[in-house]
């Protein structure tokens, strides 16, 4: 009896959180004309996650970022929310999944600017060196993942 109760609770715990069940639900704010944003959305969908998009003009998108706590130094072309976190720019899905597994107290992750070779910004095999940063609740950041240049 105890083992079946434990098994039922374990299954419930795994299905209660989207981060643990494997299928996440992203809301992405972007401009209508941004091709790299659309490519990043496809990167997320290819990993099996659900994505809803909202097209905004640049001014509304900038205000949306500010409202979510994204400062100019962390900004990129699109802003997503997933399971209580903000994902700014071309952040790889593996970094997002690690964030949701570890659940640090933070606003979210950012790939500041538009790093060449990041998801949605592919340029053949080339990738510029760049960092994905954890944006903390106080607005500061620290390196979450570093990506070396690749030719």
Feature locations, PLM:
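Bacterial N-terminal signal peptides that target proteins for export
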Residues: 1-7
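N-terminal signal peptide c-region/cleavage motif recognized by signal peptidases
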Residues: 16-18
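Local sequence-structure signature of Cys/Sec-based thiol-disulfide redox active-site neighborhoods
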Residues: 21-47
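Second-shell loop/turn segments in exported
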Residues: 29-31, 50, 82-87
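Amphipathic alpha-helical interface surfaces
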Residues: 40, 60, 92-96
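Conserved helix-turn-beta segment immediately C-terminal to the redox Cys motif
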Residues: 41-60
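Structural motif
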Residues: 60-66
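Thiol/selenol-based redox catalytic cores and closely related redox-interacting motifs
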Residues: 66-151
């Amino acid at each position: 009896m105890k083992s079946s109760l434990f098994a039922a609770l374990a299954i419930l715990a795994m299905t209660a959180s989207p981060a643990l069940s494997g299928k996440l639900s992203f809301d992405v704010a972007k401009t209508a004309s941004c091709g790299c944003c659309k490519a990043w959305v496809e990167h997320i969908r290819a990993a099996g996650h659900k994505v809803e998009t909202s097209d905004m003009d640049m001014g509304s998108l900038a205000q949306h970022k500010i409202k979510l706590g994204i400062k100019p130094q962390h900004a990129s072309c699109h802003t997503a929310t997933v399971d209580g976190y903000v994902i700014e720019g071309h952040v790889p899905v593996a970094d997002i999944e690690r964030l949701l597994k570890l659940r640090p107290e933070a606003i979210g992750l950012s790939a500041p600017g538009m790093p060449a070779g990041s998801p949605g910004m592919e340029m053949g095999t080339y990738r510029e060196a760049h960092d994905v940063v954890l944006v903390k609740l106080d607005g500061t950041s620290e390196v979450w993942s570093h990506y070396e240049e690749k030719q």
